Regions:
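Short Lys/Arg-enriched alpha/beta "domain-start" segment
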Residues: 1-202
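Short, well-ordered helical secondary-structure segments
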Residues: 3-5, 69, 74-76, 193-195, ...
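Generic structural hydrophobic/aromatic packing signal, biased to beta-strands
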Residues: 12-16, 89-91, 151, 203-205, ...
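Generic alpha-helical propensity signal that fires on short helical segments
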Residues: 28, 105-109, 229-231, 261, ...
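N-proximal short alpha-helices
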Residues: 58, 62, 67-69, 209-212, ...
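A generic structural micro-environment signature
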Residues: 159, 172-175, 212, 324, ...
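Extended, charged amphipathic alpha-helical segments
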Residues: 165-268
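Membrane-associated alpha-helical segments
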Residues: 238-334
């Protein structure tokens, strides 16, 4: 007998880096008629509320109808504006009551390949960016963006016992959006074993591409932590790619040294080194913010959720890669 979902939501994220910084005070003034609700602060009754320093602005971006192979879904769209130059756009879909698990997996597969989501998120981001442009400092949009999907189950057959529930349903098929192939037991067992809980009635499975949350009270604090982590992943990727380009420029300049006039080479070399130093300072500030975030997330459960996200997003690997590149740049620039 198929598992039936009675209540739940799907959050589809697209995260964009549009600038070096965004003045949230100025942006709030520009969007005062549209900004909905308080800054992000993870308020809950049973879990401790936490507040992110320089918490983002939340902006309502209207509604649309999303056409997927599994049906047409009304979509609520909202965005968060982060002071470190990032805009995260979220499409929220309600899971229709009575949805079978297999149909949810089919919906997941449709979401993964939907071009409509991409176009919708980009268009909403562009409109929002235009409206807050006076608040944007050092505008420079990166062509790469992050995507992620969070599935939130509030009520389903057997979900009152989350540990047993995830053994009954094919979690791996949902997380990996695989509606055609039958996945190996290893995939399913690994995901089940990685689950974290605050109480016996809730549960979170956080993977690199999507997450499953069982939240009987409809709480969104873990979902917010995942989105928060996703914005940091984008920043890690940006700095890693940017430093890689700077290294390539330096290596190219070194290769051309014999064919170039010495003072021209020195000027180019100095410019690259100076720019790299500025980026080093930017990244150092960013890294401090990430480390402070880990301390800020003071609730034990949310701290575990944040660390689980950091693990899945390979924060340590990105940090090491960036550190190696910065060390190489420093050595070459001396």
């Amino acid at each position: 007998m198929s598992t039936i979902i009675e209540k739940g939501n799907i959050l589809v994220h697209r995260v964009f880096d549009i600038a070096g910084e965004i003045s949230l005070v100025r942006a709030e003034q520009l969007l005062s008629a549209d900004a909905k609700g308080p800054r992000l602060n993870f308020p809950t009754d049973t879990r401790k509320a936490i507040i992110i320093k320089d918490s983002p602005l939340k902006v309502d971006l209207g509604e649309e109808i999303l056409d997927l192979p599994s049906g047409k879904f009304p979509v609520r769209i909202f965005a968060r504006i982060w002071n470190y130059g990032v805009i995260s756009v979220t499409l929220e879909l309600a899971i229709p009551p009575g949805t079978e698990w297999g149909l949810l997996v089919k919906t997941a597969a449709g979401l993964e390949v939907s071009n409509e989501i991409e176009l919708l998120a980009i268009s909403r981001k562009d409109v929002l960016k235009k409206r807050i442009m006076p608040a944007v400092i050092n505008p420079a949009e990166w062509e790469i963006h992050e995507d992620y999907i969070t599935y939130i189950i509030e009520k389903a057959d057997g979900s009152e016992n989350p540990r047993e529930f995830i053994k009954k349903v094919d979690v791996a098929a949902l997380i990996l959006a695989e509606d055609k192939e039958h996945l190996a037991a290893d995939h399913r067992n690994f995901l089940v074993e990685s689950a974290i809980q605050y109480s016996s009635s809730d549960l979170a499975i956080i993977d690199w591409n999507s997450a499953l949350l069982i939240e009987p009270d409809g709480q969104r604090d873990v979902a917010d932590v995942i989105e928060f982590s996703l914005t940091h992943l984008l920043e890690f990727r940006y700095y890693d790619e940017m430093l890689g380009r700077k290294l390539e420029e330096l290596y190219d300049a070194m290769d051309q040294k014999r064919e170039s006039v010495a003072n021209i080479f020195r000027n180019l070399y100095a410019d690259i080194a100076e720019d790299s130093s500025r980026k080093y300072m930017e990244f150092s500030e960013f890294l401090g913010r990430v480390e402070n975030s880990l301390k800020t997330v003071g609730d034990p459960y949310l701290a575990v959720a944040f660390k689980a996200s950091a693990l899945e997003f390979h924060f340590d690997d990105w940090r090491k890669s960036i550190s190696r590149k910065m060390e190489t740049l420093a050595q070459i620039s001396q």
